[in-house]
Amino acid sequence: MEFQDVVRRRRMVRAFTDEPVSDESVRRIMRNALRGPSAGFSQGQAFLVLRGEEKERFHDLVRPWTARSARTAPVLVVPFAVKDAYLDRYAQPDKGWTDRGEEHWPVPFWYVDTGMAVLLILQTAVDEGLGAVYFGIGAEDVDAVREAFGVPADHEPIGAVAIGHGAEEGVSPGASPNTRGRRPFDEVVHFGRW
């Protein structure tokens, strides 16, 4: 698929068929996630891929509102941001900081880079002929997810992505694009100055 088609077709899919997702597609999706930008090549992301019983276990742990529409997707990816990878990397001699201070980071790139990896997951799913939806994990559910899947303490989940074959065409009923339009280009993009 052409890149512009992938960008144009990407949307949050909220209903999935029971058709399985091939291992090859999952591996391509995850390989592309690893190709995202990484400040200082810190590579401070990790991903937990869940299928079958593990996926059901995840859904049983989180609040029902969190992933109701995503429960039927056969694949779930939980992306994690690893702040320490960035703090350690930028304390190395070639980066010029002598400490691991967070004050050097007015924008926490561990979240930015992990978010870019999520976008690559969403776009690759489209390229594979699949649908996907990103959703948050409630703060009250993070510890249960961490314990159930042996997630290291320094790995922070930034949400989850459900992946599968979309059960419907177009925008899902109740989805935000049905209630509000995309902001006009000229209202959002400013050339030279505001």
Language model feature labels by segment:
Residues 1-88, 191-194:
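N-terminal amphipathic, basic helical "cap/leader" segment at the start of enzyme domains
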Residues 53, 83, 138-142, 165-167:
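Acidic, glycine-rich active-site loops and adjacent beta-strand->loop/helix elements
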Residues 67-79, 149-173:
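A glycine-rich helix N-cap at a beta->alpha junction
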Residues 42-45, 127-132, 158:
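Short secondary-structure junction motifs
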Residues 39-42, 69-71, 126-127, 149-153, ...:
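Solvent-exposed alpha-helices and their adjacent loops that cap or buttress functional pockets
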Residues 33-34, 77, 97-148:
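Small-aliphatic-rich amphipathic alpha-helix that forms the alpha element of a beta-alpha
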Residues 88-97:
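Short, flexible, mixed-charge acidic loops at enzyme active sites
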